[in-house]
Structure formats: structure tokens, C-alpha cells
A protein has these predicted regions:
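Glycine/small-residue-rich pyrophosphate-binding loop that anchors the diphosphate of NDP-sugar donors
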Residues: 5, 65-69, 108, 113
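Short catalytic/ligand-binding loop motif for oxyanion handling, primarily in non-cytosolic enzymes
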Residues: 32-35, 40-41, 58-65, 77-78, ...
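Catalytic core and acceptor-binding pocket of nucleotide-sugar-dependent glycosyltransferases
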Residues: 75-190
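Short loop segments at secondary-structure junctions
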Residues: 17-20, 72-76
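GT-A fold catalytic core of metal-dependent nucleotide-sugar glycosyltransferases
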Residues: 6-54
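Short beta-strand-to-loop element that shapes/binds the nucleotide-sugar donor at the catalytic cleft/hinge
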Residues: 46-74
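Catalytic-loop motifs flanking and including active-site residues across diverse enzymes
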Residues: 6-10, 62, 113-117
Length: 190
């Protein structure tokens, strides 16, 4: 399943990147909207930490949302035991065979990646005590959400908020082909 692979590979691929600083994962339909949110709140942590920039789902659903997690490649390796492309392939195949994944967000397996991230990070944290999650109220997290917006116009007040970095991210309207103009307008307002 291409949907399963595109979701699950985000957990594994950071482990094989040749990069010394943090690698952040997210969703493809999320648009970062201010650079302070993604850097300011993590700069005091050392490179041994796995940092979850949100505090949603962790206490209610035993999940860690894909947005936004940052750790070094070495930490991703340690959490998921991934050291090569072959390890990624093997992990993808084994995990896919162990679930009843059906395309679409209504299937319970849709959240396999977030549940797996939670379980692996919790297990790793028992050994290392290096898991950090940040509080949305303290970080000032604020999403421009597609659910609460006019899908045809971008008023001046909203443009001003976007330009001044009020929002941490934008959850893009989809499908992109239908909402291309609005998504592009928001992107170009940044």
C-alpha cells in the first residue's frame, strides 16, 4: 500500500540520513508558518533528546502525532533499530503484514504510524530518559486550520496574522487540486 508506506517510512528514513543536527518529521499537508516555533523551543536541548513539539494525543490516545518530532539520525536509529535501506524495507514489509491496513482515514490502522512512534519512543525512553514533549500553551502553538476558514478568500486581517507569524502552521485544504489557489495564496503570503 502506497498510503501505508508514505505514512510509516517517515519513522524509519530519518535514521539513515547523514545529518548531525535534528531531523524533523511532519505530514505532507502541513505548512510551517513561522520559524521561531520550530527552533526557539528546542535550542536548549542537547542532541540526545527526542523532542515532540506538541502535547496532543500522548495522554489521551497513546499516540505521538507525526507533527512535529525532531531528533538526530542517531537517535532515530536507536529508537527504530534502522541502519540501512534494507532495514527500512524489512520493517515496512513486516509491519504491513502484521496489520489489516485499508486505504482511507476511517480504518483503525490509519494511525499505525502514530501508535508505533509512541510505543517505540516510550520503550526507548525507559532506557535513556531522553524523551521531551513540549506544552502547546507554553510554546504558543497556533494552527491556521482548514476546518475554520473561508475556502475562497483571504481577508486582510488573516494576511496580517500570517505575515506576522501568529500561526505555527497551516493545515492545507485538500484535495490540493481543488484548493490550489487558496493554498498557494496562503503560501505566497508567508
Amino acid at each position: 500500500s502506497t498510503a501505508f508506506i508514505s505514512q510509516y517510512i517517515r519513522l524509519l528514513y530519518p535514521a539513515i540520513l547523514n545529518y548531525t543536527n535534528g531531523v524533523m518529521i511532519t505530514d505532507i499537508d502541513m505548512l510551517p508558518m513561522n520559524n521561531t516555533y520550530y527552533s526557539k523551543h528546542i535550542e536548549d536541548y542537547d542532541n540526545n533528546k527526542f523532542i515532540y513539539l506538541r502535547d496532543v494525543l500522548i495522554h489521551t490516545d497513546n499516540q505521538i502525532a507525526m507533527c512535529y518530532n525532531v531528533a538526530t539520525s542517531k537517535t532515530w536509529q536507536d529508537i527504530f533499530h534502522i541502519h540501512s535501506i534494507q532495514d527500512i524495507n524489512t520493517s515496512l514489509i513486516n509491519r504491513f503484514k502484521s496489520i489489516d491496513f485499508v486505504e482511507g482515514t476511517s480504518n483503525s490502522c490509519w494511525f499505525t504510524d502514530q501508535i508505533e512512534l509512541y510505543n517505540h519512543v516510550q520503550s526507548w525512553n525507559e532506557r535513556t530518559h531522553n524523551f521531551v514533549y513540549l506544552n502547546d500553551k507554553i510554546t504558543g502553538y497556533s494552527r491556521l486550520d482548514r476546518i475554520h476558514m473561508n475556502t475562497h478568500t483571504l481577508d486582510e486581517t488573516l494576511k496580517t496574522k500570517i505575515k506576522s507569524g501568529v500561526f505555527s502552521d497551516y493545515h492545507c485544504l485538500r484535495p490540493y487540486s481543488q484548493y490550489k489557489n487558496m493554498n498557494d495564496m496562503i503560501y505566497h503570503t508567508l
